[in-house]
Regions:
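An N-terminally biased module of ancient metal coordination in phosphate/nucleic-acid-related enzymes
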Residues: 1-77, 162-169, 173, 177-192
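Divalent metal-binding pocket/active-site signature
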Residues: 15-16, 105-110, 118-192
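Charged, low-complexity, helix-prone segments enriched in Lys/Glu/Asp/Gln
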Residues: 45, 96-111
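Short charge-dense sequence patches
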Residues: 56-64, 93-99, 128-138, 164-165
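Generic hydrophobic/packing signal
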Residues: 63, 84-88, 119
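Active-site gating loops and adjacent loop-to-helix segments of metal-dependent hydrolytic enzymes
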Residues: 70-99, 103, 126, 149-168
């Protein structure tokens, strides 16, 4: 199969492969154009680009940005993920991604704290170990996988359904930038 993959995640966010491994896996599968679109970070991009230099693979810079869309008619806010491609480094982008990292780290600790009375143990140290001690890389997927490893649930989706999705006792909203502001940052970074 030859093709393009414009939405991938490495283990810098909630993927399973390192950026370097992801590049090699893409080439093995016949992919010729790959966008690394980790959640709220572009930290893996240089690693992927370096490996791809000697391979038949075009890397497109990208990021999946967590944002909020407010529906005026209901005053309700919804979390949305925007896959932004062809991103160039800009000051607004650096500021946004740094804010997102801080929000992500705080949210992960809050979720783990809310889980303590529900599961009878603190799993934060185990979760942070999954991301090499870098708290701002933690996603709910890491928390769900830890709950599976601890045999609290049987599969990651069960962790979401029982504890960490919206409406459940350990859910914490990702309070990111609004949709319009996020799009402005993407455009300021020559992205689309």
């Amino acid at each position: 199969m030859h093709g393009v993959d414009l939405h991938t995640h490495s283990n810098i966010s909630d993927g399973t492969l390192s950026p370097e491994q992801l590049v090699h896996a893409a080439v093995e599968k016949g992919i010729h154009t790959l966008a690394l679109t980790d959640h709220d970070t572009m930290d893996g991009l240089k690693l992927a680009e370096k490996v791809a230099l000697d391979l038949p693979l075009n890397i497109i810079s990208g990021v999946e940005i967590s944002s909020q869309w407010s529906r005026p008619a209901t005053q309700k806010s919804y979390g949305v993920h925007i896959v932004a491609l062809n991103m160039q480094n800009s000051e607004p982008l650096q500021i946004l991604l740094e804010q997102q990292k801080q929000i992500r780290a705080i949210r992960a600790k809050q979720i783990c704290d809310l889980l303590i009375p529900l599961i009878g143990q603190d799993i934060y140290a185990d979760v942070i170990a999954k991301v090499d001690g870098i708290a701002d890389r933690i996603t709910r997927t890491h928390i769900a996988k830890t709950l599976v490893e601890k045999k609290i649930v049987n599969r990651p989706q069960q962790a979401f359904d029982k504890y960490i999705k919206e409406g459940k006792k350990a859910y914490v909203k990702f309070d990111g930038l609004g949709l319009e502001e996020t799009i402005k940052v993407i455009h300021a970074s020559q992205g689309y």
